[in-house]
């Protein structure tokens, strides 16, 4: 269920301060964050975030069509290594 419109979008305070600082000073350095739950706002377009996926930081460049989504959606936490091969078929050959 989506968030109520009267509440507005959620962005962690510390992340909001970093974004405001970057916009004021025209600073285009990567903003490192653990806040996967923060929503991407229109003023974040053009900035690059390093979003933590539980192991390392994944660089995410924010474009216009990402507005309204959360930062964590663009930094996957699980890696798929493929299913195990069938051992019986290897033995017959």
UniProtKB/Swiss-Prot annotation:
An example Gene Ontology molecular-function term: structural constituent of ribosome
TM spans (from-to): none
Superkingdom field: Bacteria
Swiss-Prot/TrEMBL GO biological process terms: ribosomal small subunit assembly; translation
Residues in the signal sequence: none
Cellular component annotations (GO), alphabetically ordered: cytoplasm; small ribosomal subunit
Disulphide bridges, residue numbers: none
InterPro entries: Ribosomal_uS19, Ribosomal_uS19_bac-type, Ribosomal_uS19_CS, Ribosomal_uS19_SF
Key words of the record: Ribonucleoprotein, Ribosomal protein, RNA-binding, rRNA-binding
Record function comment: Protein S19 forms a complex with S13 that binds strongly to the 16S ribosomal RNA.
Family: Belongs to the universal ribosomal protein uS19 family.
PANTHER family: RIBOSOMAL PROTEIN S19P FAMILY MEMBER (PTHR11880), SMALL RIBOSOMAL SUBUNIT PROTEIN US19M (PTHR11880:SF8)
Name the record gives this protein: Small ribosomal subunit protein uS19
Source organism: Solidesulfovibrio magneticus (strain ATCC 700980 / DSM 13731 / RS-1) (Desulfovibrio magneticus)
